[in-house]
């Protein structure tokens, strides 16, 4: 699909791509731009909402600005922003398929009388219809009415009603609230009855916000709206009342739940969806089966009445054909998880709109010219720097509750705001009224497949469909717009006991000058508003100790002070204590209790936690409701059955009851997730806010000290270096905070699981034991009453069909732990890996490729004469000519006073060197670190800006052998560790080393030697002896390829071959046009046979397969055949002669060492896109190894 980017707001009206149209049911007109078939953009504020809203109707977190998007420059920015976002979506296969479906998924046409279905309001525009080619063709057909025909509902109309333009969606600017996105259906009945209706998207592309460390990608926000529009186009909108309990609100005195709309839950992805997919019985609402029936109804009408009807134009028929290629289940399975991976984007791991309860949004201005393109943020979602929007001053603050903390005399000490989550709330206890169905079979199971739900969409076919030009308009295609104004009230409560929110607020100040205090009561009671609460005991002790020392007026004094501040902050914020393992928890975060007033008693936090257990951390503990259940008695009509027939019937009942027991188990699990885990998640969010508050305080203390220092007599160049070093330390402080956040997250997630295992699951077991006792009694009594079986047969049936405890032991700890390891978080881990540089070298078809695969986008410049030769485990850099150089540029390489780093690489030196010759380093103006050759040995040197220096000489490594060098700098421990291979050869104190702020460039240089370097990496953390040993031996061992069971891959041994994308579907031989190919089996009805694979060694001395080996692959299917490549279609074809087989290179994937790649002439074997019933094994033209379909698994 092409996105029309040749548009601007001054483009002339042509009644084709640029039109003036009427807003539905109004006399409002706007200029619309067609950016793709049936997809329009209107760079205007949404007409359906008033721009001036009374204060009482403005919602918390909203921004209301009636002047926004009123200038032509703003409208132009809006139009171009939407075009860029659509091009970004269209730049991926999955996004292109989504836009193709939206373009073709037209609402079902009204009024085709000849087909025998209803045609309400068919005569809508005067007494005679306008001349129309479609209508004229229908008139000449066998339709009994002269003006009969179908009419379309997906159109926008010109201001004079003369022209109609096909439209499935229109993208407007925001409505009243300029930071609220929304999707609005045209006609409610059609949105719910299977007919379908067009949609209006209300969208804000010019502002974005942050979640944790990353900016929200506006392309993902638009994708969310596009997915939602499909629910309306397909007519499968659920009732507004179809909501599920999302979390128990702990901040309210009564038991109140937040509820989440089912569409938002399905679309958002993340942990919420991961949890849903573990429970096949979550949804028992009739919406799901009814939607499927409605879809099948209209699909059947299309098949029987429209598909073969020559009176209906291809512009309609072919669109409906593509629409019905996709099932309703495919729409339900569409969520942001799929798109975040194909877009290489990060998304919030939970429903983001609800997170405003924990994170108050600040908005940033999007600059699409400099910071964004069709690949997303130019510098990534984390590293991009966007300016804060001036609209933030207008953010509405309407807390849901104000907590007034008073003393014993009822004098107010502080007021703290508790904000709502923006979700619908209810005091109804969902679990006390919900009855688990016994006989109803409409539970909906979500698809766990990795297959993209829209793979059936043919992009090529969609592109070839003629556009809809002649419209037969159905006038009643929309409802009247009703703008509902919602009021929000703030409730104030009084408490004598400080809550967590009070403790959190006491850690926040707007004052630049303040004093830290560990006495909360003193902070809130004092008239001195400069006191701020802190739990950083060691830092406060250090600051108290030095307060009477002399002024800090030199760079050295400042560096020593800053170093101690950093160390003490790191120690305090990451302080933990090991405990005897409690339900998998063997480490407790010590500051947690003091930070949020959790378990603050006369005992220590650890003692109280060990005494009271994990459930003591939350405020609402007695929430569990025993489920309402129903189970049918065994029918007396079975009493006279024979033993065989009765056995079969009882087995059916027994099996059905086991499934019902699982439903009961999942009901308990649901309650844990909604009512218990939601409280732990709230604590996680508050703890993170507390960490950020403490970090902010420390940074302000440092900033104040730097301001004082700048008044001293310090040279400008030195002051500039101090400023840059301080900024680098601020980054290191944030990194320490992130480590602490990770610990809190891990601790509280484990605590929540502990509650399920120790508190909730035993109650489930106890409940079930009572429940099955009653069932067993009834079963025994029934069997004893049976008249057509003997006593022995009765005994057999009683033993077989009475339940035991083992029948309902469903606890699976690992599946619960997996809730917190979603695909979204895995993307985060990949981007936030410790690697700042991970060098990868390979031979391309025309030149060598030397690149950074750490994900940190390092710029690499190198001398083209550098050769690649096979080294220890892959391609190594061979620098043999004088002054051959590789430069690595990245801001992450800039060192300072407090950051840790590690350098690792394999080195082989051939020659002799007496003079000092540089190898690699990051050093400018005699400040930084470097590694050089001297006296036939290797030297590591680190020197700071004050001239303090440490050098370590390493001998006996220049002898033509390979050595694994690891150098670790730990600034918290002031420790330098150096390893050669698996041995620690140096452990040196570097406590005298201060700032080594130098440059963002690391240079690898050869002067007059011959050197080989492989697997060069730079990490942002120190490395331990255990990690070095593991890396060293795994790297050596990694030269051998392994099968799926981690065993060494052997030549001449039979294996089953799977693709990484389809790990449970093996390859089969398929005959096509008298040639044999390999494919996945995608259709049960096709009779194709599974085959075995064998790798045949070219080097007969080899037993095991190593990386970069060349071999011949044999396929065993009765006879031996061999892999070749078809010159006609690049498919892997099978030939009978080994002489005609290709010599194929075998390797492993760097990130997935259990996966294998096959290549020939640097072209990799992969699976093709779906081709009818097949995914062929093909030889791809890409010269790099992408993920997914290019990866293979061999199973013995």
UniProtKB/Swiss-Prot annotation:
This protein can also be encoded on a prophage. Assembles with botulinum neurotoxin type C (BoNT/C) and protects it against pH-mediated inactivation or protease activity at pH 2.6 (the pH of the animal gastrointestinal tract) but not at pH 6.0. The non-toxic component is necessary to maintain toxicity. It is found in: Secreted. Its main location: secreted. One of its GO terms (molecular function) is metalloendopeptidase activity. Has 3 domains that are structurally very similar to those in BoNT/C; light chain (nLC, equivalent to the light chain), N-heavy chain (nHN) and C-heavy chain (nHC). It comes from the Viruses. Forms a highly interlocked heterodimer with botulinum neurotoxin type C at pH 6.0 but not at pH 7.5. Botulinum toxins are produced as progenitor toxins of large molecular sizes of 12S (M toxin) and 16S (L toxin). M toxin consists of a non-toxic, non-hemagglutinin component (NTNHA) and the neurotoxin. L toxin consists of the M toxin and the 3 subcomponents of hemagglutinin (HA). HA is composed of subcomponents of 70, 33, and 17 kDa. The 70 kDa subcomponent undergoes proteolytic processing and is split into HA-55 and HA-22-23. Pfam families: NTNH_C (PF08470), Peptidase_M27 (PF01742), Toxin_BN_H (PF22133), Toxin_R_bind_N (PF07953). Keywords: Secreted, Virulence. It comes from Clostridium botulinum C phage (Clostridium botulinum C bacteriophage). SUPFAM superfamilies: Clostridium neurotoxins, 'coiled-coil' domain, Concanavalin A-like lectins/glucanases, Metalloproteases ('zincins'), catalytic domain. GO terms for cellular component: extracellular region. The lineage of its organism: Viruses, Duplodnaviria, Heunggongvirae, Uroviricota, Caudoviricetes. GO terms for biological process: proteolysis. Residues 1-408 are annotated as: Light chain nLC. Residues 829-1195 are annotated as: C-heavy chain nHC. This is Non-toxic nonhemagglutinin type C.
